[in-house]
Amino acid sequence: SRRQRQMCIRDRGTTLGGDDGIAVAYMLAVLDDDTLKHPALECVITTDEEIGLLGAKALDTSVLKGTHMINMDSEEEGYLWISCAGGLSGTSRIPVEYQEMEGVVTEVLIDGLNGGHSGAEIDKNRANANKLMGLFLYELGQKTAYSIKDLSGGTKDNAITRSCKATLVLGEEDLAEAKITAEKLQKDLRTEYAGSDEGITISVTTGKEETVQALSMVSKEKVVFYLVHVPFGIEKMSGEIEGLVETSSNLGILKLGKDALYSTSSVRSSVGSAKEHLSAKLQYLTEFLGGSYEEQGDYPAWEYRKDSKMRDLMADVYEELW
């Protein structure tokens, strides 16, 4: 009917939170069925999960009377959520200085990576383009002198970065070395990431000789040091649940500005203290390089409970019914 169509939220190119939609449908079906026997239920539906759990944060839990909670965030039947990582975004600002540099302006692009969601696919052994750029810059610095004019990679902290671009200033006599370094590193990385990220490409495109503003040598070394040492990937696997990533981080956003290098990492852990310790590691690294660090969007972990009568009951009932 027309009224039913008006009540439906529609869009193109998005699932509209399909997993949460299933949970809402479950709850409405139970509430709508007068034949079901169950204790008093409180069905809680919040908004804006993906952009920071804003609805959940705004919820006044004092109005709730229940003592047990069931999380219905799974998009697949037969799966029950029993734990969830907490997280935060850690933003680093590392001050840098520029000076006039004369040389051939050269663009280095690391591309072709699979990327993915840092919460769901951090265990897939996929490379992060920002981290690979740090490796390239370090390797190049072992063989020749250069400076950095620009640097950027990624737009979302929770996405494993697919590409990163650096604009360098090199002497004309060092261009060949830059291309050799790129070719060798590309070959090595495709071997290292065989089966998970074999499409990695590192391209070097030379421009014309110019006099431009580029990082001072001290600032360049700070940037490279940060990229090489900033944490990425799995920090710790769970000791209780086989195959579960307990703690991880992802360097999702990287941008060289006029006065500082800016970066944002997504930090996750299903153990609250482990999340804090990993964030502290980012803070210490940033402050060691003379920078400042800020946490944003901090939300708590839902830690695994080894003994849970409700979980065991739900598993038994599911097996009995299906």
Task: Report the location of each language-model feature.
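Metal-dependent peptidase/peptidase-like ectodomains
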Residues: 61-129, 186-190, 248, 260, ...
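Acidic/histidine-rich catalytic neighborhood of metal-dependent amide-processing enzymes
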Residues: 14-101, 149, 238-242, 246
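An extended, acidic, His-containing surface patch that forms the Zn2+-binding/catalytic region
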Residues: 205-250, 255-258, 272-277, 292-322
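Short beta-strand-to-loop capping motifs
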Residues: 110, 168-172, 265-269
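Acidic-enriched catalytic cores of C-N bond-cleaving enzymes acting on peptides and small amides
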Residues: 99-103, 122-152, 172-248, 282-284
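Alpha-helical metal-binding/catalytic segments enriched in His/Glu/Asp
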Residues: 10-50, 106-110, 117-140, 251
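A structural signal for small-residue-enriched, beta-sheet-centric alpha/beta enzyme cores
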Residues: 119, 149-161
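Single conserved hydrophobic/aromatic residue that forms the stacking wall/gate
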Residues: 1-9
